[in-house]
Amino acid sequence: MDILPTLDPNDLFSAKGLVVVITGGGSGIGLAITSCLSQAGAARVYILGRRLSTLQEAARSVGGAVVPVQCDITNCSSVSAAVAKIEDEIGYIDILINNAGVQGPDHKPARDAETIEDLQKILLIDPEGWQPTFAANSSAVVGISAAFLKLLDAGNRRRGWEGGKIPLGRPRQRDITGFTDDERSSQIITVGSISGLNRFITAGLAYGASKAAAIHLSKMLTYLLAPWGIRSNVINPGVYPSSMTAGTKDNYSYMEVPAGRKGGYRDICGVVLYLVGKAGAYVNGSMENTDGGRLSVMPATY
């Protein structure tokens, strides 16, 4: 391995010049990601969501090259319209971040049920809420990713990579003119949750199961998209400030969260900039947990 005489960390963890699409980029963790990518030099950050006013306020507050695009990620026509707008405006993307999600039915009270009857009642809360939870948290990972594949492939071609599907046994060719020190390829990042990995009900059964599905779908996309030169990685946040965690405490014992606190802006930004920057160019099929060690003190599988 050649040792570089100089290494600029600012360049290694930069989003300079990247075109990014992020669903749910107008609030919560999504807004934090939008802000950090904009500050790190992204050429354009398209934020998708149903509430246009929320997206517009996010774009105003963050500034830079943030572009709001109203889109229902569970509606094929709405997604197609968003893709068409971005294709018309710029023609490619480098990064797709599947971030939007919903909590679904709340089953946390099941932990404190004292009778079988109480447990049954709690587990049967809002049975109709499961379908929209899976639609937003799981199915949309595939739907949104599929919708943007053409633009992700165009992002690869822009970087000099050979486009399309490469036959088995042959390496992907590349013209490195203009990208001699940048070996990144297009990437899908799915924001899962440690709820998809633990066995403790932190939000609801539907939420945990749908996030587990999202995590596994991302892993499957890693394999499926390998011949096409598109990467797929997962970020699993723990307890972060958002509408879902509103009302929860700020400080924790070491047996709840070893770090003793909720995650913050720098915590999520650090993981994102690692994956989108040159530092993460060799990362594919990875699952990055940013939870302050919470999974280490909970019953979990990962």
What are these regions (language model features)?
Residues 19, 26-28:
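Conserved glycine-rich cofactor-binding loop
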Residues 38-57:
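Conserved glycine-rich Rossmann-like NAD(P)H-binding loop of the short-chain dehydrogenase/reductase
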Residues 226-231, 283-285:
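Short, small/polar-rich loop/turn modules that mediate ligand/substrate recognition or access, typified
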Residues 102-103, 109-131, 149-227, 239:
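Catalytic loop of short-chain dehydrogenase/reductase
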Residues 62-77:
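Rossmann-fold cofactor-recognition segment
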Residues 256-268:
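A conserved structural motif in NAD(P)-dependent oxidoreductases
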Residues 3-10, 273, 284-302:
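Short C-terminal tail/terminal secondary-structure segment
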